[in-house]
């Protein structure tokens, strides 16, 4: 915990998020990228990649 700074990059003076936010939990809760799916560690919501 406490490493949310790793989920952002600065490009051309703008901040860009690397991961998606969870649609259930809302902004501030990132989803983990597991290669074949996106998963929320807080609520368990999963989106499969095609």
Curated annotation (Swiss-Prot):
Molecular function GO labels: structural constituent of ribosome; zinc ion binding
Gene Ontology cellular component terms for the protein in this record: ribonucleoprotein complex; ribosome
Co-factor binding comment: Binds 1 zinc ion per subunit.
GO biological process annotation, one example: translation
Cofactor(s) in the UniProt record: Zn(2+)
Binding positions for Zn(2+) per the UniProt entry: 22, 25, 40, 43
Pfam families: Ribosomal_S27
Keyword annotations from UniProtKB, A to Z: Metal-binding, Ribonucleoprotein, Ribosomal protein, Zinc, Zinc-finger
Domain of life: Archaea
Cross-referenced Gene3D superfamilies: 6.20.50.180
Segments passing through the bilayer: none
Zinc fingers (C4-type), renumbered ranges: 22-43
Family affiliation: Belongs to the eukaryotic ribosomal protein eS31 family.
HAMAP family the UniProt entry points to: Ribosomal_eS31
Quaternary state and interactors: Part of the 30S ribosomal subunit.
Classification via NCBIfam families: PRK00432.1 (NF001669)
Name recorded for this polypeptide: Small ribosomal subunit protein eS31
Protein's organism: Pyrococcus horikoshii (strain ATCC 700860 / DSM 12428 / JCM 9974 / NBRC 100139 / OT-3)
Top-level taxonomy: Archaea, Methanobacteriati, Methanobacteriota, Thermococci, Thermococcales
Gene: rps27ae
């Amino acid at each position: 915990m406490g490493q949310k700074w790793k989920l952002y990059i600065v490009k051309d003076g703008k901040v860009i998020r690397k991961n998606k936010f969870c649609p259930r939990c809302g902004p501030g809760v990132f989803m983990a990228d597991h290669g074949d799916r996106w998963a929320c560690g807080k609520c368990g919501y999963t989106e499969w990649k095609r």
